[in-house]
Amino acid sequence: MEHFDASLSTYFRALLGPRDTRVKGWFLLDNYIPTFVCSAIYLLIVWLGPKYMKNRQPFSCRGILVVYNLGLTLLSLYMFYELVTGVWEGKYNFFCQGTRSAGESDMKVIRVLWWYYFSKLIEFMDTFFFILRKNNHQITVLHVYHHATMLNIWWFVMNWVPCGHSYFGATLNSFIHVLMYSYYGLSSVPSMRPYLWWKKYITQGQLVQFVLTIIQTSCGVIWPCSFPLGWLYFQIGYMISLIALFTNFYIQTYNKKGASRRKEHLKGHQNGSMTAVNGHTNNFASLENSVTSRKQRKD
């Protein structure tokens, strides 16, 4: 295993250059294997979990879901606040920011971004709760792709570009996650569900987040600094893939639902009209019969 790890490190060094020494010895960062194994186990559970739960009763998980979502809401709020203050104190340049130009502020950003990386491991629980509650319709290609890739991508980010221009996407994502996990936490309480109207806007916010990240990343390409260009190109490509998947999800979830509701409403309206027509016809027929009957009695 040590030989394999050494070979892997040599390969990464040849491909990406030397690692950032500021994160040497940090939990989970020295060796890629634990991150890879965690991701492989995650995908295995995604595959086997629904099969295991198929003939079993779903778990409620209500209490633990409230605690879990509250915890991630608070963690996301902490990361958002610390990243904003770290970037402000370090006088980060929006257009392009290197990884070694802000001193202690860079270290503050690195420490927060480690928590951001680690939060992606915690977020695997999102999927596990879906499996336990048998909400398999929520385990989409988008969901699995996003969760499985983010942990791995951020392992590489933390080892090579752990601050500087890397801050922007994480900052926006932390803000979105404050809204998202607070929504999930509240939706775990049945009495709160009628008041949760903003789910649609969370998805819209995620799409806006990806577009803004592409714009900010492109600034680093157009007005380059010491931040490696290869990472910027990768970021743009990854954001495009998320935009494509989230747009498809949005269309499937909201536009088709809206069209279905309109169709049902129109059908109901037509049925109502037919009922009125039939009622009128039946009443008229009844009146005719009544008149006929009276005539017959008179005769």
Swiss-Prot record:
Job description of the protein:
Catalyzes the first and rate-limiting reaction of the four reactions that constitute the long-chain fatty acids elongation cycle. This endoplasmic reticulum-bound enzymatic process allows the addition of 2 carbons to the chain of long- and very long-chain fatty acids (VLCFAs) per cycle. Condensing enzyme that acts specifically toward polyunsaturated acyl-CoA with the higher activity toward C18:3(n-6) acyl-CoA.
Q: Which reaction does it catalyse?
A: a very-long-chain acyl-CoA + malonyl-CoA + H(+) = a very-long-chain 3-oxoacyl-CoA + CO2 + CoA; (6Z,9Z,12Z,15Z)-octadecatetraenoyl-CoA + malonyl-CoA + H(+) = (8Z,11Z,14Z,17Z)-3-oxoicosatetraenoyl-CoA + CO2 + CoA; (6Z,9Z,12Z)-octadecatrienoyl-CoA + malonyl-CoA + H(+) = (8Z,11Z,14Z)-3-oxoeicosatrienoyl-CoA + CO2 + CoA; (5Z,8Z,11Z,14Z,17Z)-eicosapentaenoyl-CoA + malonyl-CoA + H(+) = 3-oxo-(7Z,10Z,13Z,16Z,19Z)-docosapentaenoyl-CoA + CO2 + CoA
The name on file for this protein is Very long chain fatty acid elongase 5
Q: Where in the cell is it found?
A: Endoplasmic reticulum membrane; Cell projection, Dendrite
Segments passing through the bilayer: 26-46, 64-84, 112-132, 139-158, 168-187, 205-225, 227-247
Q: What is its main location?
A: endoplasmic reticulum
| Cytoplasm recorded as keyword | no
Stated EC number for the protein is 2.3.1.199
- One BP term from GO: fatty acid elongation, polyunsaturated fatty acid
Q: Which residues carry this modification: N-acetylmethionine?
A: 1
**Which tissues express it?**
Highly expressed in lung and brain.
One GO term describing the cellular component: endoplasmic reticulum membrane
Listed A to Z, the keywords are: Acetylation, Cell projection, Endoplasmic reticulum, Fatty acid biosynthesis, Fatty acid metabolism, Lipid biosynthesis, Lipid metabolism, Membrane, Transferase, Transmembrane, Transmembrane helix
Which pathway is it part of?
Lipid metabolism; polyunsaturated fatty acid biosynthesis
> InterPro entries, alphabetically?
ELO_fam, ELOVL5
Q: What is the effect of changing residue 219 to S?
A: No effect on fatty acid elongase activity
The Swiss-Prot or TrEMBL record describes its family as follows:
Belongs to the ELO family. ELOVL5 subfamily.
Gene name, Swiss-Prot/TrEMBL:
Elovl5
Q: Which GO terms describe its molecular function?
A: fatty acid elongase activity
Q: How does it sit in the membrane?
A: Multi-pass membrane protein
Question: What does the subunit section of this Swiss-Prot or TrEMBL entry state?
Answer: Interacts with TECR.
